[in-house]
Amino acid sequence: MLPGSKIMFSSILPRLSWRYSEDLKAMDDTRKRLNRGLKSYLKKLRYYTIVYADFEDKHPSLFANDGIHLSFIGNDIFMHAMQSALEQFIHTPHNLVFPIDL
């Protein structure tokens, strides 16, 4: 369909609140499990994955007041990670995960 195209998965980011759920721990555990499973599966298919480690501490300044969307600073960090990942995938296409899995 699109020759030469590559598929990239952008990990699900954490949130300070989840719509339709009061159990933040259960939602975060599910998010982490999904990210791990997809990363592992997509690696086998030779697809790319971006992991956003900077968001795992869930610092409130990274999120808007609603606790769901990213703040200006959060968006800046997100876009910088996305750009860095794309550069890594272009220059070292054999590294399927950003940041590089060691």
Predicted regions and their residues:
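Eukaryotic short linear interaction motifs
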Residues: 15-19, 58-60, 87
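A short helix->loop->beta-strand "cap" motif at the edges of active sites that frequently abuts
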Residues: 2-7
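Substrate-gating cap/lid alpha-helix
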Residues: 15-54, 68, 72
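Short helix/strand-capping connector loops at secondary-structure junctions
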Residues: 55-65
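Structural beta-sheet core signal
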Residues: 9-11
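Charge-rich, low-complexity amphipathic helices
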Residues: 16, 29, 60, 97-101
